[in-house]
Amino acid sequence: MAESILKSAKINRNVGQVLKSYLRVLKLSKKPSREEFLMISKVAGAGILVIGFVGFLIYVLLTEVPKWV
């Protein structure tokens, strides 16, 4: 019984430490400016398009190339 109490106290302490670190990060962070947000959005959108295009190329290669061989 004492072991379970110690275990739960240790878990509570760990949760408290994690929450403190999350709060510290939130305090240090700032809202991005409009220009920063637009740049991040463009880069993320370009990355999504590139990954989609690569996936489409792989799909075409795996479905059409076997027909030629």
Curated annotation (Swiss-Prot):
Keyword Membrane part of the UniProt annotation: yes
CC per GO annotation: plasma membrane
Protein topology in the membrane: Single-pass membrane protein
Localization per Swiss-Prot or TrEMBL: Cell membrane
Cross-referenced Pfam families: SecE
Record-linked Gene3D superfamilies: Preprotein translocase SecE subunit
Keywords per UniProt: Cell membrane, Membrane, Protein transport, Translocation, Transmembrane, Transmembrane helix, Transport
A single GO molecular function term of this UniProt record: protein transmembrane transporter activity
Purpose of the protein: Essential subunit of the Sec protein translocation channel SecYEG. Clamps together the 2 halves of SecY. May contact the channel plug during translocation.
Quaternary structure (record): Component of the Sec protein translocase complex. Heterotrimer consisting of SecY (alpha), SecG (beta) and SecE (gamma) subunits. The heterotrimers can form oligomers, although 1 heterotrimer is thought to be able to translocate proteins. Interacts with the ribosome. May interact with SecDF, and other proteins may be involved.
HAMAP family registered for this protein in UniProt: SecE (MF_00422)
Name this polypeptide is given: Protein translocase subunit SecE
Lineage: Archaea, Methanobacteriati, Methanobacteriota, Stenosarchaea group, Methanomicrobia
